[in-house]
Design a protein with these regions (language model features):
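Cationic, low-complexity basic patches in intrinsically disordered or flexible, solvent-exposed regions
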Residues: 4, 34-37
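Conserved AdoMet/S-adenosylmethionine-binding subsite of the radical SAM
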Residues: 215-396
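Generic detector of N-terminal low-structure segments
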Residues: 26, 31, 40-41
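Generic beta-strand structural signal
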Residues: 150, 162, 173-177, 185, ...
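Canonical Radical SAM [4Fe-4S] cluster-binding loop centered on the CxxxCxxC motif
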Residues: 168-215, 219
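Auxiliary Fe-S-binding modules of radical SAM enzymes
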Residues: 37-162, 218, 224, 321-329, ...
């Protein structure tokens, strides 16, 4: 007997091993393999540890079962969908066929209603709807910049907010995807770094961002040519390598040729330098790598990217040199935010060239003008200073384009993402208090 009181929203109860049913939200459901894995995980402890340069931060374990008792199928691999169907009572042969059909409808057609799945028997539509869900993150707010950049404020089932951004260009469209609610890294120039880490996003919440963007852009089915969403960058809120398993599982679904079908060559994962996870990311995910470098000396990088105190520049660059699949055709991108009188001198530019050459890295450098946000301690380098820096790096044989800021007017530019729902709520409360006071007067 596994005796464990589960304290996660509506879940309560104790479950005997080998039972085919479990109590959830006051109802009895068949216990699928996915549910068992979640509940048995609670036997060990209901909180997981995220590694970091500061004391580890506890976050709730992600569950695949919704508060209504249905199993969420978004973010579950095809074999997992088949297992869920079998656990719900379908014969293995039929479960395999239905899993293939459901996968196609979810990721190729963008359908979230079983009743619209025309190649599945109508008699099974209600049965599936009662047991399974195909959902999207809730959209709290959508904004469009004057330059066409779009930003969405999204909300999880447990009322945590995060953001994603779509950046259109003439020849491509890039979706900036978040991996966590908040962040542990505390990078001094980044607005997200001023938030506390709330929790990791689940595979469903990561894949759901891509699906929402496709919804907004009208880009179903997935295989159509000429689509606007062509690239994905894991550069939104959070450190992807501190949520490695969920990011990996989500990107495998995004890259699946029978589903969302984005090539791994069009996906970039950005890290601030979680050195122990970089090789594993190359082997298990295999997408392009971007590194938030931002400084070339220990003193400056320790200040603005505190993870450098744990994994220094030399360790980081060696991990880049060892990254599987990096070559001149798939260069590593170094992100370098330009901060006035902090990291923007000619000497800094020359040291950057020296470091890249020393480690023989197939690399390019993206120079990012600092995007201001309220309370920041830094200023953006002057345009002529940025051009001088770029010219020195170019002269060293390394591509160093200057990124054009996008979405600044809606706080969607690099380093500006931070959910504003808490601030808005306080403003609303203040407004209500003023109205009440006026009424009393």
């Amino acid at each position: 007997m596994v005796e464990r009181v589960v304290r996660n929203d509506e879940v309560r109860g104790s479950i005997p091993l080998g039972s085919t049913n479990c109590a959830f939200a006051g109802k009895t459901f068949r216990a699928s393999e996915h549910l068992w894995r979640f509940l048995l995980g609670l036997r060990i402890g209901s909180r997981m540890q995220i590694p970091g340069h500061i004391d580890p931060v506890s976050v709730p374990r992600a569950a695949s079962v919704r508060q209504d008792g249905r199993v969420e199928l978004v973010g579950v691999p095809r074999a997992g969908i088949q297992a869920e169907l079998e656990a719900a009572g379908l014969e293995p042969k039929q479960a395999k066929l239905r899993a293939k059909q459901i996968w196609h409808w979810i990721y190729n057609r963008g359908v979230g209603d079983f009743a619209l799945m025309t190649d599945i028997a109508k008699a099974q539509h209600g049965w599936m709807t009662d047991r399974f869900a195909i959902s999207r993150p809730e959209i709290v707010e959508a904004q469009v910049s004057t330059d066409g950049t779009r930003k969405w404020l999204l909300r999880t089932d447990d009322a945590n907010d995060y953001e994603m951004v779509f950046i259109p260009d003439a020849d491509r469209g890039t979706l900036c995807v978040s991996s966590q609610v908040g962040c542990t890294l505390n990078c001094r120039f980044c607005h997200t770094g001023t938030m506390r880490l709330v929790r990791n996003l689940t595979p469903a919440e990561i894949v759901g961002q891509v699906m929402l963007a496709r919804d907004s852009l009208g880009e179903w089915p997935s295989g159509d040519e000429g689509r606007m969403l062509t690239n994905i960058v894991m550069m939104g809120m959070g450190e992807p390598l501190y949520n490695f398993e969920n990011v990996r599982d989500a990107l495998k679904i995004v890259m699946d040729g029978d589903g969302l079908a984005l090539s791994k060559r069009r996906i970039t994962l950005s890290t601030s330098g979680v050195v122990p996870m970089m090789e594993r990311a190359g082997k298990e995910i295999g997408v392009n790598l971007a590194v938030s470098l931002h400084a070339v000396t220990k003193e400056v990088r320790d200040e603005i990217v505190p993870i450098n105190r744990k994994y220094g520049i030399e360790q980081l660059l060696q991990a880049c040199a060892d990254y599987p699949g990096a070559n001149n055709a798939r260069r590593i991108t170094f992100e370098y935010v330009m901060l006035k009188d902090k990291n923007d001198s000619d000497a800094d530019a020359r040291e950057l060239v020296r470091l890249i050459r020393h480690y023989d890295l197939p690399a390019k450098v993206n120079l990012i003008p600092f995007n201001p946000w309220p309370g920041s301690a830094y200023e953006c380098s002057e345009p002529e200073r940025i051009r001088s820096f770029s010219n020195i790096v170019f002269a060293g044989g390394i591509s160093a384009p200057i990124r054009t800021p996008r979405g600044r007017d809606i706080d969607a530019a690099c380093g500006q993402l931070k959910t504003t729902s808490e601030r808005k709520t306080r403003a609303e409360l203040d407004a209500l208090a003023e109205e009440k006071q006026a009424t009393l007067s």
